[in-house]
């Protein structure tokens, strides 16, 4: 923004426009332990210096506006303003920079992810001086983390509730996602659960449509999982989607699920909103319900490399808002996810303390100060041949969710579930014996299929299926000349 002649007002106020960098670019600033730190990928318009672009981001996401205002004199800008304290060029990209911004903690309401994102990723993303802007990462200080409840229960409490240890959990999204009657839907749930799955799932699209109202679905699914529990002796769950058009209706559905005695409900946290999600998470903790989170709409926000917000930031926001599971990509399936980047935000979901590691896209060290962890869910285009890779990549604290990879079995839902359970148990056994899942995965599956006709049939159906597309979300590297 070009400087403009300042006009001196009669009370000593200097009106006019001045460059943002004069106030908001402070390379000498030493960050505080209580600051929220943000790493923005900034693409300035031609002719806009990177320092001015970074300062504009700091200003417009904190105390600044396009012109000086006389009310600036009524507060302490030095106390409340955001500061761009460091800028570095992005390797391999022309006119693209990482701008680091520090925000004083007093700018944010305690316990409100909604308020945090309203400030940091608000109007600044439409700022004309920038061609594009992407929030790559946040460092949320312990002082702010401690104002959040976080996940309703967390990983260890969920395992204790389910009495399941030492392996990933298995799930399945019921298909077709739309169009089934409630009774037929419940039948599909029962077949999958009795075949050996731990969970089945409402699709994110399923709320309360004319072909299947929510109350009918809840009742038939509860009947299905209780019947499967009685037959198998294992605790079962179905993610009943409580997402609704109002927060009041959402809570009403969660209350009904609790009255049915089911263990888990579900929410679409981005389309539903962080305020609704946090309210539901609080209800779930108070009433003993696990909370599964779907990330529908995330790719609208995080898919583009130079604009929007990286999923690792959305994942941090979810852990603060509250959820016991969240979909996190597969690395090997049909949906977006490069291995190093995916494992970076998987660790941010599960672990208590994560060191800065730019090789995995982690810009800041993050201390969660004992906030419960979130189980990542691998879902989308996966089948039995992927089981060794998924077990090796995600480890035990994960949910491996096979929708078409269960319901597409040539013999039906229950045999599809059997095939997945046998494949998983074979991979866990092989891993515990010291075998290399990455190198011997196909052999492990073939060996297991000799003793399971259901697995053998699944192996035959999906032996040629591949999703060989290059990931859009990749680490920054110098380009070859």
Swiss-Prot record:
Complex and partners: Heterohexadecamer of 8 large chains and 8 small chains; disulfide-linked. The disulfide link is formed within the large subunit homodimers.
Miscellaneous information on this protein: The basic functional RuBisCO is composed of a large chain homodimer in a 'head-to-tail' conformation. In form I RuBisCO this homodimer is arranged in a barrel-like tetramer with the small subunits forming a tetrameric 'cap' on each end of the 'barrel'.
Modifications made to the protein after synthesis: The disulfide bond which can form in the large chain dimeric partners within the hexadecamer appears to be associated with oxidative stress and protein turnover.
Binding-site residues for Mg(2+), renumbered to this chain: 201, 203-204
Intracellular or extracellular location(s): Plastid, Chloroplast
Reaction(s) catalysed by this chain's protein: 2 (2R)-3-phosphoglycerate + 2 H(+) = D-ribulose 1,5-bisphosphate + CO2 + H2O; D-ribulose 1,5-bisphosphate + O2 = 2-phosphoglycolate + (2R)-3-phosphoglycerate + 2 H(+)
Keywords: Acetylation, Calvin cycle, Carbon dioxide fixation, Chloroplast, Disulfide bond, Lyase, Magnesium, Metal-binding, Methylation, Monooxygenase, Oxidoreductase, Photorespiration, Photosynthesis, Plastid
Gene3D superfamilies in the record: Ribulose bisphosphate carboxylase, large subunit, C-terminal domain (3.20.20.110), RuBisCO large subunit, N-terminal domain (3.30.70.150)
Residues that hold substrate according to the record: 123, 173, 177, 295, 327, 379
Active site: 175 (proton acceptor), 294 (proton acceptor)
Cofactor(s) essential for the protein: Mg(2+)
Listed SUPFAM superfamilies: RuBisCo, C-terminal domain, RuBisCO, large subunit, small (N-terminal) domain
Gene designation per UniProt: rbcL
One Pfam family in the UniProt entry: RuBisCO_large
GO biological process: photorespiration; reductive pentose-phosphate cycle
Positions bearing N6,N6,N6-trimethyllysine: 14
Residues annotated as site: Transition state stabilizer: 334
UniProt xrefs under HAMAP family: RuBisCO_L_type1
Name of this chain's protein: Ribulose bisphosphate carboxylase large chain
Phylogenetic placement of the source organism: Eukaryota, Viridiplantae, Streptophyta, Embryophyta, Tracheophyta
Described function: RuBisCO catalyzes two reactions: the carboxylation of D-ribulose 1,5-bisphosphate, the primary event in carbon dioxide fixation, as well as the oxidative fragmentation of the pentose substrate in the photorespiration process. Both reactions occur simultaneously and in competition at the same active site.
PANTHER family assigned: RIBULOSE BISPHOSPHATE CARBOXYLASE, RIBULOSE BISPHOSPHATE CARBOXYLASE LARGE CHAIN
Modified positions (N6-carboxylysine) in chain numbering: 201
């Amino acid at each position: 923004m070009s400087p403009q002649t300042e006009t001196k007002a009669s009370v000593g106020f200097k009106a006019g426009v001045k460059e943002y960098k004069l106030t908001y670019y402070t390379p000498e600033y030493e960050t505080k332990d209580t600051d929220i730190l943000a790493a923005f990928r900034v693409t300035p318009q031609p002719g806009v210096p990177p320092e001015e672009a970074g300062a504009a981001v700091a200003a417009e996401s904190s105390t600044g506006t396009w012109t000086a205002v006389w009310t600036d004199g009524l507060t302490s800008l030095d106390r409340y303003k955001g500061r761009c304290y460091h800028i570095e060029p992005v390797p391999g990209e022309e006119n693209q920079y990482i701008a680091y911004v520090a925000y004083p903690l007093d700018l944010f309401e305690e316990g409100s992810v909604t308020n945090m994102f309203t400030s940091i990723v608000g109007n600044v993303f439409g700022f004309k001086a920038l061609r594009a802007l992407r929030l790559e990462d946040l460092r949320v200080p312990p002082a702010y983390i401690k104002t959040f409840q976080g996940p309703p229960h967390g990983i260890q409490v969920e395992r204790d509730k389910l009495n399941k240890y030492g392996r990933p959990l298995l799930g399945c999204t019921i298909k077709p996602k739309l169009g089934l009657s409630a009774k037929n839907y419940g039948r599909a749930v029962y077949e999958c659960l009795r075949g050996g799955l731990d969970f089945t799932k409402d699709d994110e699209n399923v709320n309360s449509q004319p072909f299947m109202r929510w109350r009918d679905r809840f009742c038939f699914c509860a009947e299905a999982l209780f019947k499967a529990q009685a037959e198998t002796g294992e605790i079962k769950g179905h993610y009943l989607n409580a997402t609704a058009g109002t927060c009041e209706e959402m809570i009403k559905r969660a209350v009904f699920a609790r009255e049915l005695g089911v263990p888990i409900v579900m929410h679409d946290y981005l389309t539903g909103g962080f305020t609704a999600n946090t309210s539901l998470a609080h209800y779930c903790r108070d009433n003993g319900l696990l909370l599964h989170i779907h990330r529908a709409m995330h790719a609208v926000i995080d898919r583009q490399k130079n604009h929007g917000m990286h999923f690792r930031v959305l994942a941090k926001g979810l852990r603060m808002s509250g959820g016991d599971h969240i979909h996190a990509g597969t690395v090997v399936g049909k949906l977006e996810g490069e291995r190093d980047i995916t494992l970076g935000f998987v660790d941010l979901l599960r672990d208590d303390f994560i060191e800065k590691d730019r090789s995995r896209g982690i810009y800041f060290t993050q201390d969660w100060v004992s906030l419960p962890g979130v189980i990542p869910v691998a879902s989308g285009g996966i089948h039995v041949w992927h089981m060794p890779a998924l077990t090796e990549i995600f480890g035990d604290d994960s949910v491996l969710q096979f929708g078409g990879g269960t319901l597409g079995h040539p013999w039906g839902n229950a045999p599809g579930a059997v095939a997945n359970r046998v494949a998983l148990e074979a991979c866990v056994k092989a891993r515990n014996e010291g075998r290399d899942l990455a190198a011997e995965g196909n052999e492990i599956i073939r060996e297991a299929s000799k003793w399971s006709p259901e697995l053998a049939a699944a192996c035959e159906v999906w032996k040629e299926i591949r999703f060989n597309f290059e990931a859009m979300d990749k680490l920054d590297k110098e380009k070859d000349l």
